[in-house]
């Protein structure tokens, strides 16, 4: 449990009052995540930088792993960008006019005139939020806007977060822009050379995204060791490569697959170190294997 999660609700209620009292800076943007710098908040950040919003706005990024990015972006000499811890981020949240998150949140009610956008991280195929049994009375609404990808999900998201029609914004997920962008900066063979190998860069890529399970032993239980070996050999013979990206909360060990030439493991950390957007990988895969999460 993080330090922020240990703070009693009574303290957060006091911070609601503090947030209402502090004047907001109209030239500041705040981005928050407690599960790494990725997904919709990374897509929003990249868009802001690519379109030079940082020339008009000061952008603060609050992350659980902010140290990994602080020096990197300092070396890039991008102006008006600051990375802080989630604890220090509270003070930036108080001052910022525009706020975005998709993982975690500060359970602080937005101040009048403050824009807090919950981008979430996908449309639910299972119960979430207030629709989960036993969570009907939990307050998940700490935003002014909630992203919803279509009218089909409007009522589901409203019930899940106990919000109104006025708070729903129908829009695509920012993260998928890279998957659909025909002008994607990283080309297919370059991506394959980085995440598979240079020699196998012409292979067709099958992307496997297993869902998160409470028991790590269950994540790949659909294939026995013998079946994995058979799949590996089939891929080698047919010039395919199966790329498995585990769920970010997964605890399985990538080194268990080192002996399989036709099966590769890629993690969010590895993609980040290679400078590859995950949705570019989806764009260039021949086939996607997954289940709902």
Protein language model regions, located:
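Membrane-proximal basic amphipathic "stem/tether" segments
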Residues: 1-34
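Conserved catalytic-core segment of nucleotide-activated headgroup transferases in glycan assembly
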Residues: 37-44, 50-52, 175-259
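Short boundary motifs at domain starts and secondary-structure transition points
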Residues: 15-25, 108-109, 194-200
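Active-site and donor-binding regions of nucleotide-sugar-utilizing enzymes
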Residues: 29-181
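Short, surface-exposed amphipathic charged segments that create phosphate/polyanion-binding patches used
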Residues: 96-101, 182-190, 278-283
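A short, charged/proline- and glycine-enriched loop
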Residues: 21-30, 113-114, 201-204, 238
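Donor nucleotide-activated moiety binding/catalytic core segment of transferases
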Residues: 83-96, 248-293
């Amino acid at each position: 449990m993080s330090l922020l999660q240990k703070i009693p609700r009574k303290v957060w209620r006091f911070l609601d009052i503090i947030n209402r009292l502090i004047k907001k800076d109209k030239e500041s943007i705040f981005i928050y995540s407690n599960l790494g710098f990725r997904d919709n908040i990374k897509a929003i950040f990249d868009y802001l930088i690519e379109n030079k919003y940082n020339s008009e706005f000061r952008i603060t990024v609050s992350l659980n792993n902010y140290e990994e990015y602080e020096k990197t972006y300092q070396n890039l000499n991008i102006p008006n960008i600051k990375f802080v811890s989630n604890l220090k981020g509270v003070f930036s949240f108080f001052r910022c006019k525009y706020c975005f998150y998709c993982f975690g949140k500060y359970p602080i009610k937005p101040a009048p005139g403050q824009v807090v956008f919950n981008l979430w991280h996908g449309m639910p195929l299972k119960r979430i939020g207030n629709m989960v049994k036993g969570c009907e009375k939990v307050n998940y609404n700490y935003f002014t806007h909630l992203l919803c990808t279509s009218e089909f999900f409007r009522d589901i998201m409203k019930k899940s977060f106990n919000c109104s029609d006025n708070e729903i914004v129908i829009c695509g997920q920012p993260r998928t822009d890279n998957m659909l962008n025909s002008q994607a900066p990283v080309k297919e063979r370059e991506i394959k050379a980085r995440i598979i190998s240079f020699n196998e860069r012409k292979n067709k890529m099958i992307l496997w995204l297993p869902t998160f399970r409470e028991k790590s032993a269950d994540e790949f239980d659909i294939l026995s060791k013998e079946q994995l070996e058979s799949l590996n050999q089939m891929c080698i013979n047919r010039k395919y490569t199966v790329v498995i990206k585990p769920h970010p909360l997964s605890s399985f060990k990538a080194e268990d697959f080192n002996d399989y030439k036709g099966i590769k493991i890629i993690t969010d950390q590895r993609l980040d170190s290679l400078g590859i957007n995950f949705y570019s990988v989806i764009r260039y895969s021949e086939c996607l294997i997954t289940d709902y999460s």
